[in-house]
């Protein structure tokens, strides 16, 4: 997980074009898509928008392995992953997805080598504190929120996070939520403590506590669509790794075998369109 990218790449011939019948005409060469994703078409392909896909979450996994496989540094692996986040962000915007949540840095990642962690903190500050990137995201109408315990970061990084949120808070385009120093367990714990304090102070009673109230205390209260419809995880790992444990209760899961920096536009499209085949029952019978 551990990489982050904001600046969008220039337009290319490999793009999605919206049409009047709520479909995208996707023109690209799909021959390079990995066979385990069952994509083997080449040429024009008509891709229908998945209904009900409002919130997509992603666990970016495989940056260090990717770098090792190519004889590159871990730093280069994280930068390569940041470029692929740009691709996914653009796709989600074009498809009309409302929310994209990116697991950028977990509370467990502090155990990584000090050199790697220091680089990531500098990379976050470089990207988030960039006036060029801030202007671009403001211009493109994207809203940015950060969830997780930000108090541990340097003052300069905390200020950059606050400026990014403040400058984009009224934007109505894709809402990008970046989980940084985030833990699903800690999110539940802090919400529980917050409610307990309110009960102790007389602001709430025990009878007032229900799922809706609890969700208002979670970090994801910053969005109307707090529960992801689809979670994408790369590198072949099949676990959620302490990410959004409450919010993922009914989320559809998609596991890609490719390492995150190896993911191409067509791979992300395959992941997003997989949502069309899911039957979401929420514990009940198929409707």
UniProtKB/Swiss-Prot annotation:
It comes from the Eukaryota. Its cofactor is Mg(2+). Its EC number is 2.5.1.-. It is found in: Plastid, Chloroplast. InterPro entries: UPP_synth-like, UPP_synth-like_CS, UPP_synth-like_sf. Pfam families: Prenyltransf. GO terms for biological process: plastid membrane organization; polyprenol biosynthetic process; response to cold. One of its GO terms (cellular component) is chloroplast stroma. Expressed in leaf trichomes and stem trichomes. Keywords: Chloroplast, Magnesium, Metal-binding, Plastid, Transferase, Transit peptide. Residues 1-34 form a transit peptide. CDD domains: Cis_IPPS. The active site is at residue 61. Its main location: plastid. One of its GO terms (molecular function) is magnesium ion binding. HAMAP family: ISPT (MF_01139). Uses geranylgeranyl diphosphate to catalyze the cis-prenyl chain elongation and produce polyprenyl diphosphate with a chain of 35 carbons. Belongs to the UPP synthase family. This is Cis-prenyltransferase 7, chloroplastic. The lineage of its organism: Eukaryota, Viridiplantae, Streptophyta, Embryophyta, Tracheophyta. The gene is CPT7.
């Amino acid at each position: 997980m551990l990489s982050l990218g904001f600046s969008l790449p220039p337009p290319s011939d490999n793009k999605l074009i919206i049409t009047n019948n709520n479909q995208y005409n996707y023109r690209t060469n799909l021959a390079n898509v990995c066979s385990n994703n069952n994509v083997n078409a080449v040429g024009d392909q008509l891709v229908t928008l998945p209904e009900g896909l409002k919130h997509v979450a992603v666990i970016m996994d495989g940056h260090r392995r990717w770098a090792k496989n190519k004889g590159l540094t871990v730093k280069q692996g994280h930068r390569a992953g940041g470029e692929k986040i740009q691709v996914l962000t653009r796709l989600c915007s074009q498809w009309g997805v409302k929310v994209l949540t990116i697991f950028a840095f977990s509370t467990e990642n502090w155990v990584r080598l000090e050199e790697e962690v220091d680089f990531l903190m500098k990379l976050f500050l470089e990207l988030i504190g960039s006036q060029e990137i801030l202007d671009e995201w403001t211009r493109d109408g994207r809203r940015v929120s950060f969830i997780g315990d930000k108090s541990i970061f340097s003052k300069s990084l905390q200020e950059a996070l606050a400026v990014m949120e403040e400058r984009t808070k009224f934007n109505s385009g894709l809402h990008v939520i970046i989980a940084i120093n985030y833990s699903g367990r800690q999110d539940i714990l802090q919400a529980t403590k917050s409610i307990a304090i309110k009960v102790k102070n007389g602001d709430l009673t025990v009878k007032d506590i229900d799922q809706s109230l609890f969700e208002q205390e979670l970090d994801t209260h910053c969005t109307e669509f707090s529960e992801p419809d689809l979670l994408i995880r790369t590198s072949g790992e099949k676990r959620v790794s302490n990410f959004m444990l409450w919010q993922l209760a009914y989320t559809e899961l998609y596991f890609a075998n490719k390492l995150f920096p190896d993911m191409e536009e067509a791979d992300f499209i395959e992941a997003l369109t997989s949502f069309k085949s899911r039957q979401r029952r929420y514990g009940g019978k198929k409707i």
